[in-house]
Amino acid sequence: MTRIDDTFRRLRAEGKKAFVAYIMAGDPDLETSLEVMKGLPGAGVDIIELGMPFTDPMADGPTIQTAGQRALEGGQTLARTLAMVREFRRGDASTPIVMMGYYNPIHARGVDRFLAEAQEAGIDGLIVVDLPPEEDAELCLPAQAAGLNFIRLATPTTDDRRLPKVLQNTSGFVYYVSITGITGAAAAQAVDVAPEVARLKAATDLPVIVGFGITSPEAARDIAGVADGCVVGSAIVKLVAEGRPVAEVLDRVAALAAGAHAA
C-alpha cells in the first residue's frame, strides 16, 4: 500500500475528490519552488506532481516549457530535484509525490541508480510521458519492483483496443488527459469528460484523475465531480512565471483545491 493508495482511501472515506497540483522543480529557482512545494499540503493539495525539467518537453505547452527552461537555466538538475524531495520529506511524511517528466534524464542517470535514489528520497510514483507500454521493461516494471507507482496517461484517442495495454501495468491512478494536444491549450468541459471517465472506470478499479485545461475553482469542481479528482498545472505555473509572491500562489492553489473538494 503506497502513500497514493492511502490518500485515495482516506478521500473516499471522507467523500471527497482528490486535488493534484503540478509545479516545475527549480522554477523560478530552487528556493522558491521548494517554498511553494512545502506550502502545497497546507493549501489543500492531496498529491503533488513535481515536474522534472527537460530540454525537449514535447507534451508540454508554452507555460510549462518555459518553466522548464527557467529551471534548467537556474541550474536545476535531476539530482537537485531529488534533493528537493528529501528536504520536503523532512517536514512531511504523508503527502504523496509523483515525479513527472521524460525518460531521457532518468536514462542518463541510470535506471537502477535513479530508482534507488527516488525511493530513498520519498518519491511515491512516476509519470513518464514518452515511455509507451511497449517499453515497460525499461522503467515501469523496475519502478514497480522498487515500490513506486507507475501512472499512465489515457487520452481521448486511446481507443478500446489500446486501453487494456495502457492499463496493464498502471498503478496508483490513471491520469486522463481531457483534451488532445499540449498542456494549457484549452478548457476542459465536464460534459465531454464524463463519458470518457466512465469508459475508463469500466476497465479499471484505479482512481481516474483528469488533467489539462483546468484553470479555475469552478472548473476544478466540475471536472472533479465527474472523476476521482483533478490536476491543475499550467494555471499554477503561470502564477510563478508572473513572479507572484509565494503566499499569493498558495492562496490561488487553496481556491482551486477548495473547488475540487466541493465536488
Curated annotation (Swiss-Prot):
Record-listed E.C. numbers: 4.2.1.20
Keywords linked to the UniProt accession: Amino-acid biosynthesis, Aromatic amino acid biosynthesis, Lyase, Tryptophan biosynthesis
Superkingdom of the organism of origin: Bacteria
Enzyme class, broadest EC rank: lyase
Molecular-function GO terms, alphabetical: tryptophan synthase activity
Pfam families linked to this entry: Trp_syntA (PF00290)
One GO CC term, this protein: cytosol
Pathway connected to this protein: Amino-acid biosynthesis; L-tryptophan biosynthesis; L-tryptophan from chorismate: step 5/5
Entry-linked Gene3D superfamilies: Aldolase class I
Active-site residues, Swiss-Prot/TrEMBL: E49 (proton acceptor), D60 (proton acceptor)
Catalytic activity: (1S,2R)-1-C-(indol-3-yl)glycerol 3-phosphate + L-serine = D-glyceraldehyde 3-phosphate + L-tryptophan + H2O
Record's function text: The alpha subunit is responsible for the aldol cleavage of indoleglycerol phosphate to indole and glyceraldehyde 3-phosphate.
Subunit organization: Tetramer of two alpha and two beta chains.
UniProt record similarity statement: Belongs to the TrpA family.
Full protein name: Tryptophan synthase alpha chain
